[in-house]
A protein has these predicted regions:
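Short beta-strand and adjacent tight-turn residues that come in two discontinuous sequence segments
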Residues: 34
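Mature extracytoplasmic enzyme cores
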Residues: 12, 16-18, 23-27, 31, ...
Length: 269
């Protein structure tokens, strides 16, 4: 059988590593999943990916090979999912973000479009689109509303597909692509047709999600799962350091990387 083997927030020594592995060997443990956590544990002296850390990792792999214990390491600090301090916002998980600007047509529109909400100061435009506005500019009043009963149903409604009025559907042929009429600062210059228009400035930004339960010196952004460059950046950061440590023992024991769980939310870009 395999077991989890946590190194807690940099509190690691060669003596402790040897004693742990020898104890596992005595009771028949055949392999370890070596993860590094830091939830509520005081910070120890070893910094993640430091030369001292590499020396301890090499010692652990050597001792595991000596005892015939397979060695599998989590692919990043923490137990979820694939990230670290080396991931910068442009290589982090991405999400769509947008702003809406209402403009009146029948004239040339020269206006600075609102910048969408961003995370970590990182934003890139994708497209600028316009469609006939459903808004008439009249506010919805509710001053005469009165709360009759402060209660909620004790059950959920039926799960199903929500239907919408056909008038709410934006027809594809009514959408105008204005991407090429917006400069790098987000200023729109457009000869707008008659009518009221909603202009969407669509872009992407970081989700801001970080690896879960990592040691203090290993906390960082999650890599972009839709980007080959981001995944290679993350993988190489680990393997460039680990491969020389692993290579002498690959024919003695099973050595690998694993992703323990997914607790970093979703991305849609």
């Amino acid at each position: 059988p395999y077991t989890y083997w946590f190194w807690m927030n940099g509190n690691i020594t060669k003596e402790g590593i040897t004693k742990d592995l020898e104890a596992m060997h005595r009771i028949g443990i055949g392999g370890v999943f070596n993860l590094e956590g830091g939830t509520g544990i005081p910070k120890g002296p070893v910094t993640y990916l430091s030369p001292e850390w590499s020396e301890l990792k090499a010692h652990a792999i050597k001792e595991a090979a000596r005892l015939g214990i397979d060695y599998v390491m989590h692919n990043c600090p923490g137990w979820s999912s694939s990230g670290g301090p080396w991931i910068t916002p442009e290589y982090s998980m991405q999400k769509l973000t947008w702003s809406e600007t209402e403009v009146a047509g029948g004239k040339r529109v020269d206006t600075l479009l609102l910048r969408p909400v961003t995370e970590l100061g990182y934003y890139r435009d994708i497209a600028v689109l316009a469609f006939p506005s459903f808004k008439n500019g009249k506010p919805v009043g509710f001053s005469d509303w009165q709360l009759l009963n402060n209660s909620v149903f004790n059950h959920r409604g039926k799960i199903g597909i929500q239907t919408y009025d056909k008038e709410q559907v934006i027809r594809l042929e009514d959408i105008i692509d204005l991407t090429n009429q917006v400069d790098s600062l987000g200023r729109l210059n457009w000869e707008a047709p008659l009518g009221n228009w909603t202009v969407i400035r669509l872009g992407h930004t970081s989700t801001g999600r970080k690896n879960c339960a990592a040691p203090d010196t290993g906390v960082g952004l999650e890599c972009d799962k839709f980007s080959k460059q981001a995944i290679q950046l993350h993988f190489n950061k680990m393997m460039d350091l680990l491969y020389p440590l692993i290579k002498p023992y690959v024919h003695q024991i099973q050595i690998g990387l694993e992703i323990d769980s997914w607790e970093v939310g979703m991305q849609n870009w």
